[in-house]
Amino acid sequence: MIEQPVSPKRKYELKRRAEKQAETRRRIIEATVKFHSTIGPARTTVARICREAHVQRATFYRHFPDSALLFEECRAFSLRESPLPDMTSFAEIADPVRRLRSALTAIYPYYRQHEQRMAAILRDADGLPGAGGAFFRFQDRLSELLAAPWKSRGQRHARILAACGHAVDFQAWRSLASRQGLNDRAVVESMVTLVRAAAGQA
């Protein structure tokens, strides 16, 4: 059987349909990110998203039949809009204290800029495993990167890794910066002191 060529009109209709579907999907993602960033994932309902995105429930579920897919798309969207600090530049610094100070100096302004959004999302992380996943993975990788140049083993390595994990933890930064009123430079030096103490350099 010989396939009939698709007419220009049909091609145009298919293209317009795909564009409309992509636009609808984008509106749903943007609406979800908006609510995740303000009231948090736990309070973000399908009804809220549908009202904000101007879609029906059936349309929402056609695009996102499960929450895991929606979380993944929202993570990708957020990281495109507000990418996490690049860790490659820190990895090139051999001195452990300089690497630590450089990394914290880069990430704390990011925390400050996105504090409301991160606080809303991470607040719900315990009850919603999908919330904050990309950021927690970033924290874990960064902690390991900062602990590596100390070249420690055993319990000493465990202490250094834990201290580095605390230093890059958003909630730890928030406690010192927002609640205690320290500026980012002061928080950096406080965390450097903590990690050096864990390494036995206090």
Residue locations for each model-derived region?
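Basic, helix-initiating cap at the start of DNA-binding domains
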Residues: 1-55, 69
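Amphipathic alpha-helical segments that line or abut small-molecule/effector binding pockets
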Residues: 30, 97-119, 188-196
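Short helix-capping/turn signature of helix-turn-helix
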Residues: 64, 123-127, 167
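Hydrophobic/aromatic-rich alpha-helical bundle segments in the mid-to-C-terminal region
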Residues: 149-194, 202
